[in-house]
């Protein structure tokens, strides 16, 4: 459960940063949340944070009419798949 919470926190922070700097590239946004990622000891959580953030950003890029809440819901709905891909299953 804590893995999921940490992933959602990272995605939320990334979306907040994107709202402040709408022209920021994905790399800049990931760099912004890098401190959150580095705080984690579990490699799967770190990878999950990166994958989930990229999924949320890609979702918003492909669906510009959607808002951050919808992107976060999209990530949450796909969290089992994200965690599985992060753990290499």
PLM region descriptions:
Residues 1-89:
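Intrinsic-disorder/low-complexity detector
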């Amino acid at each position: 459960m804590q893995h999921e919470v940490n992933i959602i926190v990272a995605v939320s922070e990334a979306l907040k940063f994107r709202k402040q700097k709408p022209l920021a590239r994905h790399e800049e946004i990931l760099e912004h949340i890098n401190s959150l990622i580095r705080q984690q000891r579990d490699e799967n959580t770190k990878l999950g944070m990166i994958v989930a953030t990229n999924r949320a950003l890609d979702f918003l890029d492909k669906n510009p009419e959607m808002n951050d809440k919808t992107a976060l819901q999209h990530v949450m709905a796909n969290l089992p798949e994200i965690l599985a891909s992060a753990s290499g299953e």
